[in-house]
Amino acid sequence: MSRYTGPKWRLSRRLGISLSGSGKELARRPYAPGDHGNTGRRPKLSEYATQLREKQKLRFTYGLSERQFHNLFLKAGKIRKGLHGTNFFILLETRLDSVVFRLGLASTRPQARQLVNHGHILVDGKRVTIPSYEVKPGQIISVRERSKKIVPILNSVEASLNNTPFVEFDADKLEGKLTRYPEREELGADINESLIVEYYNRLG
């Protein structure tokens, strides 16, 4: 399954979560799209549909294809320490595009992915163009010298509140780092990862 490229606001309303991170989609229309969306409540879902919806919420939040998402889920299951769902969250958050987003170098995850793809981002001084690159705590994430005047980057940094507890960022140098692995309570409070584990366990 390919990465979703359709209307994000409509999808946000269908899933009941802000995929942009701004919350504007749900503030304006806090109901599902369609003729029967504005009824004041969402229809009751089956157990399978609830699990699928939770999986889709997380997958679309990080903008991954089903194959990328499932492979990362399987990788998380091979980590011996910790819970499967929590480890899955950590792997999602330590992707290079996620760290670039958390540092405030991009205003959205798709924008962060584009910065990485186009070679604007360095890891420990070396250009990395793979959004799924796994960042380790202490690695320095910076902007390539010739890219430091790119307007979207500067605008994102200026607008960023930079309140992510597991990263540090120097706005003057346009560089930062993942200081430690995130704790579960610092991530996705509106996501129930146990439902995602149940979904994939059901598939076998």
UniProtKB/Swiss-Prot annotation:
<protein>
    <recommendedName>
        <fullName>Small ribosomal subunit protein uS4</fullName>
    </recommendedName>
</protein>
<feature type="region of interest" description="Disordered">
    <location>
        <begin position="22"/>
        <end position="43"/>
    </location>
</feature>
<dbReference type="GO" id="GO:0042274">
    <property type="term" value="P:ribosomal small subunit biogenesis"/>
</dbReference>
<dbReference type="GO" id="GO:0003735">
    <property type="term" value="F:structural constituent of ribosome"/>
</dbReference>
<keyword id="KW-0699">rRNA-binding</keyword>
<dbReference type="InterPro" id="IPR005709">
    <property type="entry name" value="Ribosomal_uS4_bac-type"/>
</dbReference>
<dbReference type="GO" id="GO:0006412">
    <property type="term" value="P:translation"/>
</dbReference>
<feature type="domain" description="S4 RNA-binding">
    <location>
        <begin position="94"/>
        <end position="154"/>
    </location>
</feature>
<dbReference type="InterPro" id="IPR018079">
    <property type="entry name" value="Ribosomal_uS4_CS"/>
</dbReference>
<keyword id="KW-0689">Ribosomal protein</keyword>
<dbReference type="InterPro" id="IPR022801">
    <property type="entry name" value="Ribosomal_uS4"/>
</dbReference>
<dbReference type="GO" id="GO:0015935">
    <property type="term" value="C:small ribosomal subunit"/>
</dbReference>
<keyword id="KW-0687">Ribonucleoprotein</keyword>
<comment type="function">
    <text>With S5 and S12 plays an important role in translational accuracy.</text>
</comment>
<dbReference type="Pfam" id="PF01479">
    <property type="entry name" value="S4"/>
</dbReference>
<dbReference type="InterPro" id="IPR002942">
    <property type="entry name" value="S4_RNA-bd"/>
</dbReference>
<comment type="similarity">
    <text>Belongs to the universal ribosomal protein uS4 family.</text>
</comment>
<dbReference type="InterPro" id="IPR036986">
    <property type="entry name" value="S4_RNA-bd_sf"/>
</dbReference>
<dbReference type="InterPro" id="IPR001912">
    <property type="entry name" value="Ribosomal_uS4_N"/>
</dbReference>
<comment type="function">
    <text>One of the primary rRNA binding proteins, it binds directly to 16S rRNA where it nucleates assembly of the body of the 30S subunit.</text>
</comment>
<dbReference type="GO" id="GO:0019843">
    <property type="term" value="F:rRNA binding"/>
</dbReference>
<dbReference type="Pfam" id="PF00163">
    <property type="entry name" value="Ribosomal_S4"/>
</dbReference>
<keyword id="KW-0694">RNA-binding</keyword>
<comment type="subunit">
    <text>Part of the 30S ribosomal subunit. Contacts protein S5. The interaction surface between S4 and S5 is involved in control of translational fidelity.</text>
</comment>
